Amino acid sequence: MRKLGLIAGGGALPVELASHCEAAGRAFAVMRLRSFADPSLDRYPGADVGIGEFGKIFKALRAEGCDVVCFAGNVSRPDFSALMPDARGLKVLPSLIVAARKGDDALLRRVLDEFEKEGFEIEGAHEVMGEMTLPRGRLGKVSPAPEHMADIDKALDVAREIGRLDIGQGAVVCEGLVLAVEAQEGTDAMLRRVADLPEAIRGRAERRLGVLAKAPKPIQETRVDLPTIGVATIHRAARAGLAGIVGEAGRLLVVDREAVIAAADDLGLFVLGVDPQERP
C-alpha cells in the first residue's frame, strides 16, 4: 500500500485517521496545518506547514516518500490578504482568490488540482477508513418516532437545498419550523444558536423534538469535504433539545463511531442513515 500524506486541519477526524493508519500498519506522514492541527499529531513523522506554503508541503511530502494525500479536518477560509505564502504559494494565490469568489467547493477543487498537477493522488477519508461512513438505517439503539418523520424529511430537504446554493451542509427543523441553517460558522456554532432559542419552539431533555440533517452539496468534492459528525455533535444536539440526527448513508463521516453510538444511546438521540436517492 502506498504511503499516505495526511494534510491535517482541526478537529478529531485527522487524529482518528492517523490512529487508524498506525493500527493498520499503513505508512504515513502528517502535514500539520499551523493553528488548526491537534497537538497530539506532533508525535507522528511529517512537518508543520502554513496554508499558503505549497512549496514546503510538496517538498515535505516527497521527502517522506508520500504519493497519496488525504485532506482531513476543519480549516477556516483564510484571509488572503494576511497569508504568508512561500514562492510556490505565490504562484497559486491569484487562482485561489478567483476560485474562492465562486464558492468553497470551487476553492477546494483548485487546491486539489494543484496537488494532482504535482503528481499526488487524492484519497478521501472515507477511502482511508471504509467503515467510517454512516450506514443505512439506525445507528445505535434509539429509533425515530413517527412524529419525527416529517421533520426528518423537511430537514433533509432544507440541507440539500442550501447545499445546492453552496451555503452549507446542515439544517435544523423542529415541528415543521426551520430553526437554523448552517453557513460559514459550521455545525457546532449552529447548534449553539439553536440551544439559545426559547424552549417554546424547540425540544428539551424531557421532551426531545427536532432534527439535525447533514447532506453533502450536489457538486461537492467528496474526497475532501464530506459532512461529518462526532461525539461533540451528539452532545451539542442534545443540549439543543433535538431528538436526533439524520444523514445520507455513505455520504456522512462518523468520527469515533463507537463513542458516537454510546453518547447517542445514553442521551436518547437517534442517528439515522437514509438512502441518498430516497426519502426516509
Curated annotation (Swiss-Prot):
Pathway: Glycolipid biosynthesis; lipid IV(A) biosynthesis; lipid IV(A) from (3R)-3-hydroxytetradecanoyl-[acyl-carrier-protein] and UDP-N-acetyl-alpha-D-glucosamine: step 4/6. To a lesser extent, can also use Mn(2+) or Co(2+). Keywords: Cell inner membrane, Cell membrane, Hydrolase, Lipid A biosynthesis, Lipid biosynthesis, Lipid metabolism, Magnesium, Membrane. Changing residue 220 to A: Loss of catalytic activity. Its EC number is 3.6.1.54. Optimum pH is 7-9. The activity is relatively constant between pH 6.5 and 9 but declines sharply below pH 6. GO terms for molecular function: UDP-2,3-diacylglucosamine hydrolase activity. It is found in: Cell inner membrane. The keyword Protein biosynthesis does not apply. It catalyses: UDP-2-N,3-O-bis[(3R)-3-hydroxytetradecanoyl]-alpha-D-glucosamine + H2O = 2-N,3-O-bis[(3R)-3-hydroxytetradecanoyl]-alpha-D-glucosaminyl 1-phosphate + UMP + 2 H(+). Gene3D superfamilies: 3.40.140.80, 3.40.50.20. Substrate binds at residues 12, 74-75, 169, 187-188, 214, 226-233. InterPro entries: LpxI, LpxI_C, LpxI_C_sf, LpxI_N. Inhibited by high concentrations of Cu(2+) and Zn(2+). Completely inhibited by EDTA in vitro. It is an enzyme of class 3 (hydrolase). It holds the Pfam family LpxI_C. Consists of two domains: an N-terminal lipid X binding domain (LXD) attached by a flexible linker to a C-terminal catalytic domain (ICD). Binding of UDP-2,3-diacylglucosamine by LpxI induces a conformational switch that brings the catalytic domain close to the lipid-binding domain for specific recognition of the substrate and catalysis. Hydrolyzes the pyrophosphate bond of UDP-2,3-diacylglucosamine to form 2,3-diacylglucosamine 1-phosphate (lipid X) and UMP by catalyzing the attack of water at the beta-P atom. Involved in the biosynthesis of lipid A, a phosphorylated glycolipid that anchors the lipopolysaccharide to the outer membrane of the cell. Can functionally complement lpxH deficiency in E.coli. Cannot use CDP-diacylglycerol as substrate. This is UDP-2,3-diacylglucosamine pyrophosphatase LpxI. It comes from Caulobacter vibrioides (strain ATCC 19089 / CIP 103742 / CB 15) (Caulobacter crescentus). The lineage of its organism: Bacteria, Pseudomonadati, Pseudomonadota, Alphaproteobacteria, Caulobacterales.
